[in-house]
Amino acid sequence: MSITAERRTALIGEYQTAATDTGSPEVQVALLSERITNLTEHLKTHAKDFHSRRGLLVMVGKRRGLLDYLKRKDQARYQTLIGRLGLRR
C-alpha cells in the first residue's frame, strides 16, 4: 500500500524543481497522487475497509489544498503539473 523507497526517489527526481528539492508542491502532489492510486486499487479489493477509505479522503483533500495553493501562486506550474499527472482539472 505504501510507496517503495525506489519509487519515492524516482518520483522526487521526476518532479523536483531543483537538485535538492524534496518538498515543493509539485513533489508533494506527485507523492500523494501515487499513494492515492495505490490506495484506490486496495479499496477495489477490500471494499469494506472504511479506515483506509477515510485515509484516502484525507489524502485527496490534502492534494486538493496543495493544488489550490499552486494555482494561486503560479498558474503555469499548476497547469504543467496537472498535465503531467493526468488530473482532470
Curated annotation (Swiss-Prot):
Keyword terms, alphabetized: Ribonucleoprotein, Ribosomal protein, RNA-binding, rRNA-binding
UniProt keyword annotation of Ribonucleoprotein present: yes
Top-level taxon in the UniProt lineage: Bacteria
Entries under SMART domains matching the protein: Ribosomal_S15
Record has Magnesium as a keyword: no
UniProt cross-references to Gene3D superfamilies, sorted A to Z: 6.10.250.3130, S15/NS1, RNA-binding
InterPro entries linked to this entry: Ribosomal_uS15, Ribosomal_uS15_bac-type, uS15_NS1_RNA-bd_sf
GO CC annotation terms, alphabetical: cytosolic small ribosomal subunit
Alphabetized GO MF terms: rRNA binding; structural constituent of ribosome
Ranges in a coiled coil: none
SUPFAM superfamilies: S15/NS1 RNA-binding domain (SSF47060)
PROSITE patterns assigned to the protein according to its UniProt record, in alphabetical order: RIBOSOMAL_S15 (PS00362)
SUBUNIT field: Part of the 30S ribosomal subunit. Forms a bridge to the 50S subunit in the 70S ribosome, contacting the 23S rRNA.
Function of the protein: One of the primary rRNA binding proteins, it binds directly to 16S rRNA where it helps nucleate assembly of the platform of the 30S subunit by binding and bridging several RNA helices of the 16S rRNA.
Name of this protein: Small ribosomal subunit protein uS15
Record lineage: Bacteria, Pseudomonadati, Pseudomonadota, Alphaproteobacteria, Acetobacterales
